[in-house]
A protein has these predicted regions:
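N-terminus-centered regions that define maturation/targeting leaders and the start
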Residues: 2-6, 12-173
Length: 173
């Protein structure tokens, strides 16, 4: 009976994982500085940019992209929700160094659609990482591609990166 309980426990714990792919790991040095006029590093993301507000894309700007970069990618994840992908935007131009709306090429997010999914934590405080990757070449990934395909392409072409982290707190649950 004890072996059966241990086996059931191991199976339950294994089921708590995530099918979300890991973020790019070989992204070059963290030389890019990402900022937002809506929130500071580590600060609360205003309600306007969450599911309880309008759900707008927060305005982002960045500096420090190497001159050799041919394109930029932007990945927004919630690491507190097993790397839930809120947005994967690819092959953005290197100039202007800003984004405040939809991108021409977007991979599917964890919701299964393209585009921005605003933060909506079920309970507690969640961290949202807005990471900009400088790419040595456009990824060539098609709009609507799977997240894993896009992340592999970013990993292959990233020469530098930088992250801005904001938080959203919820008392629901």
């Amino acid at each position: 009976m004890r072996a059966l309980l241990v086996g059931a426990l191991l199976l339950a714990v294994a089921g708590c994982g995530s099918d979300n792919p890991a973020p790019p790991s070989d992204a070059g040095p963290a030389d890019i500085v990402v900022t937002s006029s809506a929130f500071d590093e580590g600060a609360e993301i205003p309600e306007q940019f969450t599911c309880t507000g309008v759900g707008d894309i927060p305005p982002l700007t960045w500096t420090g992209v190497p001159a050799s970069a041919a394109a930029v990618a932007l990945v927004v994840i919630d690491p507190d929700a097993h790397d839930y992908y809120h947005w994967v935007a690819l092959d953005l131009p290197t100039s202007p160094a800003t984004v405040d709306g939809p991108a021409d090429v977007e991979a599917r997010n964890s919701k299964g659609s393209t585009g921005w999914t605003p933060p909506c934590p079920p309970s507690g405080t969640h961290h949202y990482e807005f990471t900009v990757y400088a790419l040595d070449a456009p990824t060539g990934v098609a709009d609507g591609s799977e997240t894993a395909r896009a992340l592999d392409a970013i990993d292959e072409h990233a020469i530098a990166h930088g992250t801005l982290t904001g938080v959203v707190s919820s008392s629901a649950g």
